[in-house]
Regions:
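Short, acidic/polar
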Residues: 67-87
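Core domains of carbohydrate- and sulfate-ester-processing enzymes
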Residues: 17-64, 157-174
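N-terminal structural segment of carbohydrate-active enzymes
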Residues: 1-2, 12, 17-20, 72, ...
Length: 174
């Protein structure tokens, strides 16, 4: 059995330790104090209640993925999130909304996990054809730059479902 963890690095929950909108974790989150060690992870338009969030869901504040503090915490520190779990035996990560992560972030993450375990898997959630994906006006390099080992193949999933339901006679499978 291989254990692949779900890496959600695009956003956090509004009631996570890092944001703590409901003060569940003692009021040290970015929503509670500008002195929070996590404050710079987020973009506040008007602190604390007006902030950038994933697809405008205020329960999912978006993270500044390339902020040096976030990069250290998630990837590069000796006991970063990915290093911690890889050293405990995780076999890789599935990246939630990979197309909303900068290529540079994915490349750093890949280097780190492969440095710990060269056989680790880095799988991306990409809903469209990942080989031709353009996100935020930029052609993605999931495969051409060797960023991801694989992607979740939703176009194939859709083709199978359409065929089973008799919608297209299997045209999408050719």
């Amino acid at each position: 059995i291989k254990v692949i963890l779900d890496g959600v690095y695009s956003h956090t929950g509004s009631n996570s330790l890092y944001f703590d909108r409901n003060r569940t974790f003692g009021g040290n989150g970015a929503f509670c104090t500008r002195q929070s060690p996590y404050y710079n992870w987020y973009t506040f338009y008007e602190w604390p209640a007006n902030y950038h969030s994933w697809w405008n869901f205020d329960t999912l504040p978006t993270v500044n993925k390339m902020h040096p503090d976030f990069i250290r915490y998630i990837i590069t520190d000796e006991d970063s999130v990915v290093a911690h779990w890889m050293k405990l035996g995780a076999d890789g990560f599935r990246l939630d909304v990979a197309d909303e992560l900068p290529d540079e972030f994915i490349q750093l993450l890949r280097q780190r996990i492969k440095g710990i375990n060269p056989d680790a898997l880095l799988l991306g959630e990409v809903w469209e054809d990942a080989s031709t994906k353009i996100a935020y006006d930029r052609r993605r390099s999931y495969f051409t730059a060797g960023e991801l080992d694989s992607v979740m193949n939703y176009p194939f999933r859709t083709a199978i479902i359409d065929y089973v339901r008799g919608h297209d006679g299997g045209k999408a499978l050719k």
